[in-house]
């Protein structure tokens, strides 16, 4: 287990209230022994949490939790904006924006996907896209959906289903102003989004070319159908100096 994984585990315990505000965490020595790692690794885990403002460490009192109980800041309930002018992302100031699909794969859903409403072991399709500005990766976006959803095609379309187009090949796009969901005939009722700031996992950091465990925004969007079943999930990651924006119409 590396420092990032230990930090993620401790962060979850803080969020769940196992370590409430003001509580003292294990010493570096005890944390290292608990996870079978070096004291340097344990110290790095606390440093990662400290960078997020979740803990404070000093020589006299050790490491204590500074995070308060987790809350939700709900930005509103709204309908999709005009898709003819909507942009999923863009450079904040200037630069050339590009986007590339780097991975398309089929796999059995791991246990952690149950939190998104996907049954463990179900066949899913995972698509990864890297967004760049002037050739430098800035955002990592992963989309996960049940295989049955990914295999759908527009009426009259012949060829590989758009969501199954391999990485590196041109994928057909929905006509301008039409949602992909409508184009592919998906039943879409609502999307729930959650934005957190936390250490990014190793694969994302590698894709963005940044140090492992670097903190970042994690934006999870779970889209469900009229029966409450998960249609697809998107997980977008970006470093903390980026911005997350939202338009609420009306």
Model feature map: region roles:
Residues 1-7, 33-34, 44-123, 142, ...:
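HTH-adjacent hinge/linker in prokaryotic transcriptional regulators
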């Amino acid at each position: 287990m590396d420092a990032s994984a230990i930090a993620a585990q401790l962060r979850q315990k803080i969020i769940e209230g196992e370590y409430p505000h003001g509580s003292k965490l294990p010493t570096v020595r005890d944390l290292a022994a608990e996870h079978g790692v070096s004291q340097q690794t344990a110290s790095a885990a606390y440093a990662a949490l400290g960078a997020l403002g979740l803990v404070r460490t000093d020589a006299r009192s050790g490491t204590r939790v500074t995070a308060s109980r987790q809350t939700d800041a709900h930005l509103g309930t709204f309908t999709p904006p005009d898709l003819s002018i909507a942009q999923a992302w863009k450079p904040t100031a200037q630069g050339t924006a590009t986007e590339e699909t780097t991975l398309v794969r089929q796999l059995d859903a791991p246990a952690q996907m149950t939190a998104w409403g996907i049954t463990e072991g179900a066949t899913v399709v995972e698509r990864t896209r890297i967004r760049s500005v002037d050739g430098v990766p800035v955002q990592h976006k992963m989309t996960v959906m049940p295989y049955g959803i990914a295999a759908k095609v527009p009426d009259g379309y012949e060829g590989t289903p758009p969501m199954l187009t391999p990485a590196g090949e041109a994928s057909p796009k929905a006509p301008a102003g039409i949602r992909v969901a409508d184009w592919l005939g998906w039943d879409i009722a609502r999307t729930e989004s959650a934005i957190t700031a936390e250490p990014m996992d190793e694969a994302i950091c590698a894709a963005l070319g940044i140090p492992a465990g670097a903190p970042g925004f994690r934006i999870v969007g779970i889209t469900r159908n009229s029966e409450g079943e998960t249609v697809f999930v998107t997980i977008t990651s970006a470093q903390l100096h980026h911005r997350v924006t939202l338009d609420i119409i009306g």
